[in-house]
Amino acid sequence: MNINPFANVSLQDYLEIVQIVDSTFPIGSFNHSFGMENYLREDTVTDDKGYEEWQEAYLASQFKYGEGLVIKLVYDAMVTDNIDQVWYYDKVLTVSTQARETRQGTKMIAKQMLRLIQRLHAIPVLDDYQSKIRKGVAFGNPAIVFALYVFNKGLGCNEAIALYGYSVISTMVQNAVRAIPLGQFAGQEIVLRSFSQLEKMTQEIQELDASYLGANTPGLELAQMKHETQVFRLFMS
């Protein structure tokens, strides 16, 4: 898949997007393992190989049919000037998340992401999103925040999915480096190997419609639920 991220985006805007997807952007993602820590607790994940298998499963299900797909759907809605559809996707994706900690963690990340982006850039549509969350008529999802932000910047949909996916992978690997633990070199090898899966998923997502939104693998959801009662843990979810 060939992309040209600078086709409709200035270098300044592109760098501002890169700032948002940097794993050091302080939105709280480092506090969440999204169930991976439960696999550690049960000795299902014990090393770099086990972690990479977990990550591949997470990306192929929860990310692909969740945050990855919702970016594509937000783009479709914004192209047709149907902002109400975006708020509908916010609701669908939130209520389809079974694990309470994951649901709450996602909302916390979205709220912090909104606060930071709005402090830096003040995007009108994100003002609307923030207002709806405060009023309790929207929940908040970081992928939707990101999609609205980069659509406003003129970034293409495929590029948006790929960059957001990279951000997710980078953060999860850094969490695994701390928790398993993994060596930094092993972690970066996993990041590099994940790019082919991310490219393939980015293409596959373009073929999906809203009926797939929120689909997930039961094993991942169960691990996220069990994490809620896990006694010793590093992460909030």
From Swiss-Prot:
GO cellular component: cytoplasm
GO terms for MF: nickel cation binding
Subcellular localization, as worded in the UniProt entry: Cytoplasm
Keyword Heme assigned: no
Keyword flag Chaperone: yes
Keywords, in A-Z order: Chaperone, Cytoplasm, Nickel insertion
InterPro entries with a match to the protein in the record: UreF, UreF_sf
Any Pfam family hit: UreF
Main location: cytoplasm
Quaternary structure annotation from Swiss-Prot or TrEMBL: UreD, UreF and UreG form a complex that acts as a GTP-hydrolysis-dependent molecular chaperone, activating the urease apoprotein by helping to assemble the nickel containing metallocenter of UreC. The UreE protein probably delivers the nickel.
Purpose of the protein: Required for maturation of urease via the functional incorporation of the urease nickel metallocenter.
PANTHER family (UniProt xref): UREASE ACCESSORY PROTEIN F
Similarity annotation: Belongs to the UreF family.
Protein name, UniProt field: Urease accessory protein UreF
Species per Swiss-Prot/TrEMBL record: Streptococcus thermophilus (strain ATCC BAA-250 / LMG 18311)
Gene: ureF
